[in-house]
Every structure is written in C-alpha cells, then in structure tokens.
C-alpha cells in the first residue's frame, strides 16, 4: 500500500510540474483526492503557515504599491553595479537579507531581473548568481524572525529548553556563513564565463539576447516610509516573540501566540502603509508580489496537504525504519528533512510534519535545531516560483532545466548551501545551546 501511495504522490507532483506555477497546488489537491479514494485519511492543512504568508504578503504588497519595493531594488541595483565583479557573491547576500527582513522568499523575485542584467553586462553566466540568489532566499527562510517556519520551530523547541532568541542565535549565523561559503565555492569551482556557453552564443547570433542597461526607476514619495513601517512591524514581531517566550518568564499567560501576533501586526502594517502612503487598495490586488504570494499559498495548500497526508498515514513505518538509524546517526535527520521538503513544498510545512516525529524519537535539541536548515530543499524539483522565475528571466539560456529534471543549475549550489548550514548549525549549536 505504501508503494501505491508514494506512486500517487509522485505522479501528482509530476503533473503539477508539467502544469507549472499554481498548477502544482491544484495537482496536490487532486493527489489528496486520489489517496482518499483508496482509503487514505487526508492529513492536516497547514492553515497557520498559509495565514502567516498571506498576512506578510499583504504587508509587502502594500509596501510595493507605495514604492518601497522599487526603493529596495534600486538600492540593490546600485550595490551590484558598484561591485559587478562580485555578482555571484553579492547577489545571494542581498536576497538572504531581504528574505530575513520580509519573512518570505517571494521578495527576492523583484531582484532577479537586476541580478541577471548585471551578470550579462559583466560577461558572467547569469545562472551562477541567479542560482545562488534563489537558493540563498530559500535557506534564509529558516533564519527569518517572522517566517512561519521559524515561528513554528520556536514554539516546538520552547518545551525543550530552546528559546526564540537561542534559536535565532544559531540559525542566523549558521545560515549566513553557509550562504557566504557556498557563494565562494560556486565562484571558484564553476566556469562562470558567459562567452564559453554554446547555447548563449547561439541565442546571441539569433538576436534573442538583449542588454537593457540600468533602468531608471522613479521612487515614489512614500517609498522610504513604507519600508520603515514594514521594518517597524518586523521589530514588533521580534519583541513580542521575546516577551511571549516562556523561557524569558516576562508574561505568565500571554494574550495570544506568536502566529496571531504576526497576523495582527502585519495586517496593521498594511493598513498604516495604505493610509499614510495613500495607497490604492485595488492596485495591491494587481501587484506582482500579491499574485506570486497568493499563488504560493495555493501551492503550499495543495502540495503540503498531499505530503502531510502521505507522511501522517505512514508515520509508524517512518519511525520504525528511521528511528534506530537516526539515533545512531543524528545527521541523517537533515537528509530526511531535505528530501521531504521537496515533497511538502514549504519549509514551515516540512517542519510541522516531521519535527514532532523527530523529537518523539528522542533526537537531541541540538540535532533538531542544526537540521532545521535542511527543510530548505525546495529547489530539488525545479517547480518553485522563484526558481521558475529565474529560468524565465535569463534570456541567455544558461539558467535552464535539463532533460532529467534534477540536472539544473540550482541543485549543486542548493545542496552545498544546505549541507554547510547544517554543519555550521551543529558547530555553533554545540557552543550556544
């Protein structure tokens, strides 16, 4: 039966990959329907994860319409054009900190055209900085103070003596170090010379490659204000999470959990941005960030539900099979997280589906925290929105998906980044936890 269920899950994901975009969420729902038809009980839908993403996307979309995203992209472009030789290193650093700031990797979508353009002008294969930038944004989700994944992980680890601040003190430096080392390795080990790529040369001869140059962006009057309002919201979430933390003991009985606090604060930020920056709410619905974010929510709804259905109905088999192995080789937990995240399509959904199982197997808090970064394997299957966008934005043809699905330019940098983040997590965690 397990084999049949796995085949259904893989076929649903394959269909979703063929449909593309929001279609993977649709196919996930179809997969759950087929599993239910053969007697498998549907799993849990990660509504708390989806609600956090929706609230954060609403605030970011309001900021985008107010001009805040253009302002951030403009600052990014200035940084990259001042240091074009280091594009493969700087691009992932930029997307890392933007994701830390926003709590969602969708914010990096706005920077991808700039990264691709600067790379072309410098004669660097766009696939190098684009791949490291996309992967960096995915890894940064496991370090953002307001991401659904970190908020959930914090709530789980509180009962094991790991506070919100302790968690951040490990995941932020370990993931940042991993991104830096991964970027250096990609720069040194792979040929980045654009003129050496035969597909690029062919497309150039056919006139399919265009150099657009630096775009002049008109920054709206409320742009900086919208960025500061969003930053204020992020700080508010962090402060509340610290105050709310049982290990801090500042509040005996908190009024609400951190998830609800994020929803309230982010919706309030969206309201203040709309009022103070005079934003037309109709334009928010039509913004690229809102569309991408809501599409991601549907994808997570379908795929995470499909993945949780499979995992929850086979949890005993997973425990029996993996229990002794993980206790003897704790690092294998990271491997399980890594491949499961490709099926569950969300860092938070993966943590929510598998972290309780890991802790039930008496995995140490250090192993759980260090392995947390491994839930960032969303790049394994080339279907995630930021990954697909990077492929579409590169008109040189260097960022392409191979015939065998897994042979794409994101796989090696991503695997390197995740492996390094886990290793650094074990090292730093042994000192800090």
Curated annotation (Swiss-Prot):
Disruption phenotype: The growth the dcuA-dcuB double mutant is severely impaired during anaerobic growth with glycerol plus either fumarate, malate or aspartate, whereas single mutants are either unaffected or less affected, depending on the C4-dicarboxylate. The triple mutant dcuA-dcuB-dcuC is completely devoid of C4-dicarboxylate transport (exchange and uptake) during anaerobic growth, and the bacteria are no longer capable of growth by fumarate respiration. Mutant cannot grow with L-aspartate as the nitrogen source.
Ranges facing Cytoplasmic side: 19, 72-85, 148-228, 283-292, 351-355
Topology feature Periplasmic, residues: 38-53, 104-132, 247-264, 311-332, 374-433
Record's catalysed reaction(s): fumarate(in) + L-aspartate(out) = fumarate(out) + L-aspartate(in); fumarate(in) + succinate(out) = fumarate(out) + succinate(in); (S)-malate(in) + succinate(out) = (S)-malate(out) + succinate(in); L-aspartate(in) + succinate(out) = L-aspartate(out) + succinate(in)
Membrane-traversing stretches: 1-18, 20-37, 54-71, 86-103, 133-147, 229-246, 265-282, 293-310, 333-350, 356-373
Induction notes from the record: Expressed constitutively under both aerobic and anaerobic conditions. Expression is only slightly affected by the growth conditions.
Mode of membrane association: Multi-pass membrane protein
Similarity comment: family membership: Belongs to the DcuA/DcuB transporter (TC 2.A.13.1) family.
PANTHER family tied to this protein: ANAEROBIC C4-DICARBOXYLATE TRANSPORTER DCUB, C4-DICARBOXYLATE TRANSPORTER DCUA
The protein, known as: C4-dicarboxylate transporter DcuA
Species, as recorded: Escherichia coli (strain K12)
